[in-house]
Amino acid sequence: MIQDIAPHTYHNEYKPSAPDKNSFILAYEKGSILLPHQEREADIYFPRFQDLEEKVSDLYSKYIYLFSIDDQRFYLIPELDTTLLPDYEFQDIRNLRTARPQHLAFAGVTGHQLFQWYSKRRFCGCCGKPMLHSQKERMMECPSCSNQEYPVLCPAVIVGITNGDKIILSKYEGRRFKRYALIAGFAEIGETIEETVHREVMEEVGLKVKNLRYYKSQPWSFSGTLLFGFF
């Protein structure tokens, strides 16, 4: 699973310290992530501040601390002028699903979820004024009306429906993902995760399920969800 990065350890405590030269830079453009030009089969590599500091003059003035893996810190650069970086390009974030090393792939995907959240919280949804970053926690606050916004996490289920030695797979029409997959869907307001399973299965394949067993959970930052797995 994408979050299984042992022996590395993910630290999501919010510690808005300044980057050093060895800190990693994560930069995104819609559904793409900045990576060096390289073969698709090669291990991924994110630029460090020391790699770009001579090319981007204001690099150390517009960063956002994201998280750490082991003792390596990762920072978001929200608007990076890539015309100054001919050795880099934006690549589809979905490429990280199978990228190696896995701890960097996990970092890139998780950072993209935070990038999307920050991008959509630039202005207050209540009064329209620019939002400010809290220095105490991962939160955006409006200095005008005191509205506070925290990262959004959407609960969802993924279900392995079995009958003997068979399992149901489905394919969604009109989706970018063309392969067969397990039944999955988002929880709705006012229902439990277990009720979500029953509703989604009925909606998608018209079946009633029983003997529901919880398996495990998984962060899935591609869609901003926390997946709960069931059989």
Where are these regions (language model features)?
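A gly/proline- and charged-residue-enriched helix-loop-helix capping module
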Residues: 83-126, 130
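A short catalytic or substrate-binding loop motif that flags glycine-/basic-rich loops and adjacent residues
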Residues: 18, 58-59, 151-153, 222-224
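Active-site segment of metal-dependent pyrophosphate-handling enzymes
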Residues: 59-72, 164-166, 206-231
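The catalytic Nudix box helix
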Residues: 181-216, 230
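Short edge beta-strand segments in beta-sheet-rich domains
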Residues: 91, 137, 154, 209, ...
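Cys/His-rich short segments
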Residues: 110-162
